Amino acid sequence: MAAEDTPQDIADRERIFKRFDTNGDGKISSSELGDALKTLGSVTPDEVRRMMAEIDTDGDGFISFDEFTDFARANRGLVKDVSKIF
């Protein structure tokens, strides 16, 4: 059984998503993802493409908040680390 989201989990996800979604259109593009990941360290275009392919489950070329939430729930430790930076 999956762990329940705490109010802090939800707030962290919303804050990180808004930080990554720099143009505020409600979705994260590959360039926005790449820019955000660069603040975390060196990232190659191939790594960005792989992450987009993993997170963008509907294949529309953008990460929606729902897709981001699914990824965050599956990678809670990673998201907690990222939330400390953002």
From Swiss-Prot:
Gene3D superfamilies associated with the record: EF-hand
Residues that, per the record, bind Ca(2+) 1: D21, N23, D25, K27, E32
Binding positions (Ca(2+) 2): D56, D58, D60, E67
Superkingdom of origin organism: Eukaryota
Classification via Pfam families: EF-hand_7
Residues in EF-hand domain copies: 8-43, 43-78
Swiss-Prot/TrEMBL keywords: Allergen, Calcium, Metal-binding, Repeat
Repeat listed as a keyword: yes
MF terms in GO: calcium ion binding
InterPro entries: EF-hand-dom_pair (IPR011992), EF_Hand_1_Ca_BS (IPR018247), EF_hand_dom (IPR002048), EF_hand_pair_protein_CML-like (IPR039647)
CDD domains registered for this protein in UniProt: EFh
Name by which UniProt lists this protein: Polcalcin Che a 3
Protein source organism: Chenopodium album
